[in-house]
Amino acid sequence: MRLGVAATPDVAIPTLDWLLGTDHEIALVITQPDKPSGRGRVLKQTTVAEWAEIHKIPVIKPQSPTELIGHLEDVDCVITIGYGVLLPQVILDIPRYGFLNLHFSLLPAYRGAAPAQRALLNGETVTGVTVFQLEKGMDTGPIYSQLSIKVEPHWRSVELLSELAHQGPNAVATALSMIEGNIKPTAQSGEPTLAPKITKEEARLNFSNSSESIVNAVRAFTYEPGAWCLWNDQPFKITSASVDGNQTLASGEVIVSEKRVFVGCGRDSAIELLTVVPAGKKEMPAIDWARGARLLGGENFG
């Protein structure tokens, strides 16, 4: 088939790479416009745009969905992967087989912008990917294919997203084969749940919560927007942590014991800090930060 791909983030790359090796043709890539980046606010294009340029595939960066009119009429199907733009039905109806979306959850669970992060936040042990027919409702369309994976307990969002991204080609392959075989997708069934975008304020850690919920928050929010708290009134990010069952500390209390750093949580529980990002610094082992901070005892995270 002659395909378009509408995508923005790095997680689209495994599927794009796979498509290059198939009999399908990537006729064009659609991605978001270049945006200012870094301290110099220099315009930077998306990872997907860079990929398309390397492989000499036409790229369009519409400011508005209506700019897609005139580009999709000779395309059989468009696959979207984290494109980040809601498309009206008039656009979805242009390609012969419409738009497919690769979504990082087992729909109808976790409809929305942050399915992988929400799954980690809720302590899910199984999640997966879904390829479905895109329609104007948010992640409500009928399903072509689903693949489930086990969520390893040490995975953070970066590791989970990487694994889900590498499951994408298999799910997309099944969906495209079904379309070519004139097999119709199946309506979603079950109780839907939502996965709205993570806000910075939501990512602030509350040490009165249980150690399990705080570790899940660290897993979910690393690295974007980052699980954070305050240390000496400055933002302080925790990028990896584990539950510890041997310490009894006040909520937010920080101690160093046997070259390990512990923080008290709610319900008489505690976590061990593994890696952190102090204000103005790069990521480092928690014990290195603690040595530099010269903890005296009685200090607390805010």
Task: Show the residue positions of the predicted features.
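An anion-binding loop in the catalytic cleft
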Residues: 207-302
